C-alpha cells in the first residue's frame, strides 16, 4: 500500500463503497458552482476595483440601466431614468 498512487487508492475506495459516488459528484458540483460564482463576483460586481489608478470608484460609472444584481424579480432596468448627478 505504500507504493500505490493516490488515484489507485481512490479507485479502490470507490470500488469498495459505490455509495460514495453521488456524494463525490454533489461535492464537485457544489465546489464548481461556488468557484464560478466567485469568478462572476470578481468580474462583474461594481464594488470590485482591479485598477485603482484609472478607475478608483467604479460604482460611479454605472448608469441606472446597468443590472449588476444576480436576479432582479420586479425591477425593469431598461425603464429606469437617470436621477443622480455625474461625478
Swiss-Prot record:
Q: Which residues cross the membrane?
A: none
InterPro entries documented for this protein: B12D (IPR010530)
Q: Which top-level group of life is the source organism from?
A: Eukaryota
Which family does the similarity line name? Belongs to the complex I NDUFA4 subunit family.
Q: What is this protein identified as?
A: NADH dehydrogenase [ubiquinone] 1 alpha subcomplex subunit 4-like 2
Whose protein is this, by species? Mus musculus
Q: Which gene encodes it?
A: Ndufa4l2
Amino acid at each position: 500500500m505504500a507504493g500505490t498512487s493516490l488515484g489507485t487508492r481512490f479507485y479502490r475506495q470507490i470500488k469498495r463503497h459505490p455509495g460514495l459516488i453521488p456524494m463525490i459528484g454533489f461535492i464537485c458540483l457544489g465546489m464548481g458552482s461556488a468557484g464560478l460564482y466567485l469568478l462572476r463576483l470578481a468580474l462583474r460586481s461594481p464594488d470590485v476595483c482591479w485598477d485603482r489608478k484609472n478607475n478608483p470608484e467604479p460604482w460611479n460609472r454605472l448608469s441606472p440601466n446597468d443590472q449588476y444584481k444576480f436576479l432582479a424579480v420586479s425591477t425593469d432596468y431598461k425603464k429606469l431614468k437617470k436621477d443622480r448627478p455625474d461625478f
